[in-house]
Amino acid sequence: MTKFIFVTGGVVSSLGKGITASSLGRLLKDRGLNVTIQKFDPYLNVDPGTMSPYQHGEVFVTDDGAETDLDLGHYERFIDINLNKFSNVTAGKVYSHVLKKERRGDYLGGTVQVIPHITNEIKERLLLAGESTNADVVITEIGGTTGDIESLPFIEAIRQIRSDLGRENVMYVHCTLLPYIKAAGEMKTKPTQHSVKELRGLGIQPDLIVVRTEYEMTQDLKDKIALFCDINKESVIECRDADSLYEIPLQLSQQNMDDIVIKRLQLNAKYETQLDEWKQLLDIVNNLDGKITIGLVGKYVSLQDAYLSVVESLKHAGYPFAKDIDIRWIDSSEVTDENAAEYLADVDGILVPGGFGFRASEGKISAIKYARENNVPFFGICLGMQLATVEFSRNVLGLEGAHSAELDPATPYPIIDLLPEQKDIEDLGGTLRLGLYPCSIKEGTLAQDVYGKAEIEERHRHRYEFNNDYREQLEANGMVISGTSPDGRLVEMVEIPTNDFFIACQFHPEFLSRPNRPHPIFKSFIEASLKYQQNK
C-alpha cells in the first residue's frame, strides 16, 4: 500500500519545507523506493499560470502540461523524477472542481460545505498522486504556516486521512525555527513548542520535527523539544543553514531521518543509504575554480525567482567544467542599441529567457543584435527564440517594423503569430501549448551536435509560434531552422552557423536539467562561453 508523508511548517514562512521534502524524497529514492511528491498551495488561483512573476516567481511546467509552483522544480531536480498534474493542488482548483460538481447536481441537492466536500476533494487528489505513479511513498508539502486560515481545510484533510488509511500508513513531519537570541546568547525552543501546540490543536501530532537553525543544537535542546512536543528524541532532526542546498540531504541522512521514516511506515527499502553520487556532486559544488559571466537579459530580473529553473540549469552546466556561474542580471527595459555594449561588453555569454508582453521586448532585441554582431555566445529560450527571428528579420532581411503579433498586432511583418489552434481561444489560463512535445533535429546542425540524436522531447509553454510565411527568407539569408515538430509544421529551434554559438529554442529546456545531468543545450552554451572567455 502507498504510504503518505505530510510536511507542514510553523513559526515563519520560508523555512525550507520544500527542500526538506525534496531531500527526504531523495533519501528514500536512493533506498530503492518509488517516490512521488506534491505541493498543496492554499491560494485561490486555479494554478499559477496567470499570476505575475513578481507575485509568484516562475511557473514550472510538467510533462503533462500542468502549470505549477516553482517548488516542483526543486522536487524534480533533487529527486530526479518527472512529476504530473496531480503534484500541485491549489485551493482554487479544489473549490472550482467542487463548485462544478454542485452545478451539475452531483451532490443531489445537499448543502455543500468545507467538511466533508472540500476535504474529500483534497483527499481524492492526495490518493491520485499515488495511484497515477504507482508510488511506494507520496510526500506532500502543505503550503503556508500552521494556523493560517487559508490552510485549515488542507490540515483537516490530512488529519482525516490518518483515520481513513490507518496510522501505519501516514506520517507527519513538522518544520520549525530555532531562533538564536543574540542578547541572551542562546537558542530558544519556545516558538517550536507553540507551533507544535497549534498543530496538535488541529488534531495532528507530528512524528518528526525538523528544526531550522543557524547553529549546532545541543542534545539538551533536542531533549527539551522532544519532551515538550511528545516525540522520540531521535525524531528531532537538526537542519543547519548550509552554503549549498545540496548539503541538506546529507545532513538529514547523518541523523538517520530515512531510517526513522522507513521504520515508522514499515517500508521495504531495497538498499542501504547510497549517496555516493550526491557526495561527488557536493564535492564539485564546493570546489569550483573560476567563474563564467552570463548576461541574463530579462524583464523580471528584480525578482530572480522568476527565472529560477534557468539559474539552476546554468549552475548545473557549470559543474562539468568546475566553474561557478556569475549571472549578470540585466533589465531589458534599460538596454538599447546604443548602450548595449555598456551592459554586455564584458560578459562571456548572453541568454534571453522566456516572457510575455510588449514591455522591455526592444531591449531584448538589442541584446540579441549585440550577440549576433559581436559573435558572443547566445542562447534564446521561448520568447528569446521568437525575438531572435524578429531581430534577424529586421536587421538582416531588412523588414522594417517586423515583430511578433503578440507584441505589436499592427506589425506589417508578423514574424511570430498565433498558433492556428489558438485563434478562437479567449481564456488565458491553461490554454497555451503546454507540456512535453517531440522535436525533430536537422542533420548537420549545431542542434544535432548538442543533442547527439535526431529526435528529442522538450517541455513547452507558449501561445505564439514562428510564422512559416517567412521561413524561406530566413533560411536563404543564413538562419538555419534546426528543429521542428515531427510534421515539420512548427519551428522549434533556430541557429546561425556563421556565429561560433548562436542557438535558440521555442521550448523550455530548463525544466529538464538536473544537477547531476545538465541539460545538453545549457552545457554546450556554457562550454562555448568558456571558450569565448579564454579567447578574449
UniProtKB/Swiss-Prot annotation:
A GO cellular component entry from the record: cytosol
Keyword Nucleotide-binding: yes
Residues the record lists as binding CTP: 13, 148-150, 188-193, 224
Residues annotated as domain Glutamine amidotransferase type-1: 293-535
Alphabetical list of Pfam families matching this protein: CTP_synth_N, GATase
Superkingdom assignment: Bacteria
InterPro entries, alphabetized: Class_I_gatase-like, CTP_synthase, CTP_synthase_N, GATASE, GATase1_CTP_Synthase, P-loop_NTPase
Annotated metabolic or biological route of this protein: Pyrimidine metabolism; CTP biosynthesis via de novo pathway; CTP from UDP: step 2/2
PROSITE patterns: GATASE_TYPE_1 (PS51273)
Residue numbers spanned by region Amidoligase domain: 1-267
Binding site for ATP: 14-19, 71, 240-242
Residues the record marks as active site: 382 (nucleophile), 508, 510
Family in the record: Belongs to the CTP synthase family.
Other remarks on this protein: CTPSs have evolved a hybrid strategy for distinguishing between UTP and CTP. The overlapping regions of the product feedback inhibitory and substrate sites recognize a common feature in both compounds, the triphosphate moiety. To differentiate isosteric substrate and product pyrimidine rings, an additional pocket far from the expected kinase/ligase catalytic site, specifically recognizes the cytosine and ribose portions of the product inhibitor.
UniProt xrefs under PANTHER family: CTP SYNTHASE (PTHR11550), CTP SYNTHASE-RELATED (PTHR11550:SF0)
Name listed for the protein in its UniProt record: CTP synthase
